[in-house]
């Protein structure tokens, strides 16, 4: 009976251990690293090295947890795979650190006495709960590398779109200059820059269309001059360029060529053309107001003059004289009657 009770207790303890092992999550978080545990797997190091995997370190460690955490703490290289062997092969060496640049570069195979750990950069779950944005992207994980590249491409496209939409020209310079082409003039000739990359080619075509519109309005622009009496556009720096000759109006001074200076705004586009339209509309409004005011003033003057003339004409009549004349006539008639 005693032996049977001991056997039952041992079975219960083993079942509890298996249950707790199955309930434990294979993923843990440690020092900005997500560590995923895969028991029963190991790596074929020779074949993996042929495909681009990099062997980092092979040493002795007490537990698999320490082996995986030491891989996470490596700062010199990106360690994203650790293998812990329960039964060391030789000289008590049981911990292996490997860097896999891609998923296909590391070949896995089953192994009963080994545990494979996949280490990836991550964010503290507490920070995720409090909705704090990450300050870095995942660079350790080979599985998330393509996602990172896609994110970077999307961010670059957004920045390019914002930059192009925000780079509408705002001009501030002396009003005597009207030449607006993006040129660098040395000896009565200007050189326009032609960019080689696709993005800069699109930007150049867009900038040319914008320059054409500005030339129709003919505003003035700022420029930046260097000690060699050359003007340099603030958005173009020396990049593999080709020079093409363009004619320059003879009335312009070669030492005072002006270039477009565009100022980008994230929330709105502000151009000198809009300023000209606003000034034209304001001038038209002022002219109309002045005309209306002058017409009203002239009307008031005419009314005042007319009323004054009417008053003068009415003032020439003398009703008293009429009354006195009629009285004299009556008196004369009365005297004639009396005399008769």
Swiss-Prot record:
Residues 306-340 are cytoplasmic. It is found in: Membrane. Its main location: membrane. Residues 320-340 are annotated as: Disordered. The chain crosses the membrane at residues 285-305. Pfam families: MANEC. InterPro entries: MANSC_dom (IPR013980), MANSC_N (IPR011106). Residues 25-284 are extracellular. GO terms for cellular component: plasma membrane. Residues 37-117 form the MANSC domain. GO terms for biological process: epidermis development; epithelium development; extracellular matrix organization. Glycans are attached at residues 118, 187, 260. One of its GO terms (molecular function) is serine-type endopeptidase inhibitor activity. It is a single-pass type I membrane protein. Keywords: Glycoprotein, Membrane, Signal, Transmembrane, Transmembrane helix. Residues 1-24 form the signal peptide. This is MANSC domain-containing protein 4. The gene is MANSC4.
């Amino acid at each position: 009976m005693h032996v049977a009770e001991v056997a039952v207790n041992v079975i219960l303890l083993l079942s509890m251990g298996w249950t707790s092992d199955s309930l434990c999550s294979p993923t843990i978080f440690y020092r900005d690293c997500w560590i995923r545990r895969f028991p029963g797997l190991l790596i074929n190091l020779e074949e993996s090295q042929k495909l681009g995997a990099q062997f980092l370190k092979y040493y002795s460690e007490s537990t698999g947890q320490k082996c995986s955490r030491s891989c996470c703490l490596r700062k010199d290289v990106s360690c994203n795979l650790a293998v812990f062997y329960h039964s060391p092969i030789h000289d008590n060496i049981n911990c292996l650190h490997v860097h896999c640049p891609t998923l296909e570069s590391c070949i896995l195979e089953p192994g009963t006495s080994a545990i494979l750990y996949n280490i990836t950069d991550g964010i503290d779950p507490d920070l995720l709960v409090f909705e704090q944005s990450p300050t870095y992207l995942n660079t350790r994980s080979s599985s998330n590398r393509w996602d990172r590249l896609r994110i970077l491409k999307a961010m670059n496209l957004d920045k390019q779109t914002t930059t192009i939409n925000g780079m509408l020209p705002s001009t501030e310079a002396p009003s005597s200059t009207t030449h607006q082409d993006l040129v660098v003039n040395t000896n009565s000739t200007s050189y326009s820059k032609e960019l080689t990359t696709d993005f800069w080619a699109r930007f150049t075509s867009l900038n040319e269309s914008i320059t054409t519109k500005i030339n129709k309005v003919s505003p003035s622009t700022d420029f930046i001059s260097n000690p060699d009496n050359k003007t340099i556009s603030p958005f173009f720096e020396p990049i593999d360029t080709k020079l093409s000759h363009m004619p320059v109006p003879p009335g312009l001074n070669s030492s005072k060529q002006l270039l477009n200076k565009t100022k980008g705004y994230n929330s709105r586009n502000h151009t000198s053309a809009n300023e000209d339209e606003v000034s034209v509309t304001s001038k038209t409004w002022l002219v109309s107001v002045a005309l209306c005011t002058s017409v009203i003033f002239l009307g008031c003057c005419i009314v005042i003059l007319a009323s004054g003339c009417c008053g003068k004409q009415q003032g020439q009549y003398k009703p008293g004289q009429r009354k006195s004349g009629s009285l004299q006539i009556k008196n004369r008639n009365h005297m004639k009657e009396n005399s008769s």
